[in-house]
UniProtKB/Swiss-Prot annotation:
Protein name: N-(5'-phosphoribosyl)anthranilate isomerase
Organism: Marinobacter nauticus (strain ATCC 700491 / DSM 11845 / VT8) (Marinobacter aquaeolei)
Pathway(s) annotated for this protein in UniProt: Amino-acid biosynthesis; L-tryptophan biosynthesis; L-tryptophan from chorismate: step 3/5
Reactions mediated catalytically: N-(5-phospho-beta-D-ribosyl)anthranilate = 1-(2-carboxyphenylamino)-1-deoxy-D-ribulose 5-phosphate
Pfam families in the cross-refs: PRAI
Length: 209
């Protein structure tokens, strides 16, 4: 099998370059001011300019105002939108762009319902539930809550690192994995060695599958 990799929460050009060199399929830019990994429009333009052809630049939003999303789209060449809050399907669909929806998993049946509600998405990202934070928790969740029947590509996030990503891929068999804190030296600053180790584990398990 093949598992694609998205590196999220990038804030430095050299980290984009390192992620791409390791084989990242997508990089994530956070447009959510409370996050320690948030970038402004000028930072985002610089980072997006480092993203080559065939690697997706993804913009992450949490309960944004419509005007803000439109301002980002006007300023930054994003390939994909990621909505990580409580956005409605209608809101997500209204920008005329490809998008994915994040679900913070805490109970059985929640993922199945999200597949139905957000059926126009290009994928569903499943992450750990935290009552105080929208993602970026560094925590995993009970993967047995993920159904085998998946009408959309499933992206696995939540507490992934080189220590557990191989097991995650073997157990969940996701379309893609999404990592941020598991490849950092500090919030927003990626660690080249951790990036390399993460990709080695992904490639190892996919090759042997």
């Amino acid at each position: 099998m093949t598992a694609r990799v998205k590196i999220c929460g990038l804030t430095r050009p050299q980290d984009v370059e390192a992620a791409v060199a390791c084989g990242a399929d997508a990089i994530g830019l956070v447009f959510y001011a409370p996050s320690p990994r948030a970038v402004d429009l000028e930072q985002a333009r610089i980072l997006a300019a480092k993203v080559p052809a065939f690697v997706s630049a993804t913009g992450l939003f949490v309960n944004p105002e419509r005007d803000y999303v439109e301002a980002v789209l006007d300023a930054v060449p994003l390939d994909l939108l990621q909505f990580h809050g409580d956005e409605s399907p209608e809101f997500c669909q209204s920008f005329g762009r490809r998008w994915i929806k994040a679900v913070r998993v805490r109970e059985p049946g929640q993922i199945e319902q999200a597949f139905a509600d957000y059926h126009q998405a290009s994928g569903l990202l499943v992450d750990a539930w935290d009552p105080n934070r929208y993602g970026g928790t560094g925590q995993s969740f009970n993967w047995s809550l993920i159904p085998e029947s998946r009408p959309l590509p499933l992206i696995l996030a939540g507490g992934l690192s080189s220590d557990n990503v191989a097991r995650a891929i073997e157990q969940v068999r996701p379309w893609a994995v999404d990592v941020s804190g598991g490849v950092e030296e500090s919030k927003g600053k990626k660690d080249a060695t951790k990036l390399s180790q993460f990709f080695k584990e992904v490639h190892r398990v996919c090759k042997t599958d």
